[in-house]
Amino acid sequence: DTITRLARTFITSEQVPLIPADLNLQKPLVELPDLILENALASWQQLIRDGEGLHGIAYDRLLTDLAANQQVVVCVDTVHGASRRYISRLLNNPPQERLILLRDNEDPTFGGIAPEPSSANMQPTIRALADRSEPLKIGAIIDPDGDRIRFTDGTIEISMNQFGAMAYHFLHEIKGKQGMVAKTVASSNLANALARQ
């Protein structure tokens, strides 16, 4: 409700309080004074590293283990979206022979498909994993702006909402984590239902 209210206020007003009145938004970013560039992926990775004591995710160890484990193959379909630029770095550039990237080139038409992490669009990932001999298979398809994802082990598919519910359950019941649950607009109310339990 707060986000919607603020967005409506900003849209209808002449001035947005978070943007200086003298800032010319028609200028290229490189010409804007005092602009501080941010590496969003590196910042996120540092937040995860710094928060290990809170959430228990040993990010660097996970990446090292992934790179060293010859039994694992990962296949990610970015559907020509912006996330295509970050997947390898997100996973700390694992061996290329065990990281399959599908539809990872720029294509503003998204190859003529609806660029969503649907079961139909997951099929190339499933086929790519079926051709692999590694016993542990992780597949994912990510929508173009990277906020929706679907997973597979090559056989079973797990939607974003199912994964979220499983993760919440694991964090609360197995890891004993307590606190608020955050979710996106695209998420279902499955997390809400679990939180009420």
Regions found by a protein language model. Give the residues of each.
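Gly/Ser/Thr-enriched, mixed-charge loops and adjacent short helices
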Residues: 1-133
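Acidic, glycine-rich loop-and-beta core segments that form the ion-binding/anion-interacting portion
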Residues: 100, 111-194
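Proline/glycine-rich low-complexity loops and linkers
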Residues: 2-44, 154-197
